[in-house]
Amino acid sequence: PADVARLEGEGMNLRHKIAIGALVLVSTSFTSFLGKWEGTGQNVVYADPLALGLPTVCKGITRYTSPVPVVVGDYWSDARCAEVESLVVSKGQLALADCLTNQAIGQNTFDALSSHSHNVGVPATCASRAVGLLNAGDIAAGCKALAWAPDGRTPVWSYVTDAQGKKRFVPGLHARRIDEAGVCIK
């Protein structure tokens, strides 16, 4: 039985679905979705006010994700943005796939989770209630949990912490979470 389960993919992460082409890294739909929320044409590194001035460029590339320095004021060509974005997204999606074990997760759900993890970090997404529900087989509840607390009314993943340590709700972040939840369930 254990050998049969392994052959059927139960308990395995989703990297094998990527290897066989059942899930696509840096899909066109994901790249477009990321551009919607992270912006396009952001070629000059800026201090992101929502991230306490974290230097950010292109579609949300920061020093935490980039293999090259991200320095406020530097100019990145479109080609450099595309190259580094592809590396950053691929690396993030492979790490995300390691924590996803529900073989029913399809491209849309994977893309939604990829957007979430690109924004809040792979470790936070992997530790989220949403991923727990998705891995347990409840796709609908897991997708909803990207934007909402268990009560279905309280926004989640939609707050920033200011320099004084106070959490502040950001409507734009919640709009992104709602959009991710919608893509996730498609």
Give the positions of each predicted feature.
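Long, amphipathic alpha-helical surface segments
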Residues: D3-A22, S29-L52, I61-R63, V68, ...
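Alpha-helical protein-protein interaction elements
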Residues: L25, S29, N102, N108-F110, ...
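Small-residue-enriched, tightly packed secondary-structure blocks
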Residues: L54-K59, F110
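Amphipathic, alpha-helical segments enriched in basic
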Residues: G60, P67, V71, S114-S117
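Mid-length scaffold segments of soluble, non-membrane domains
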Residues: D74-R129
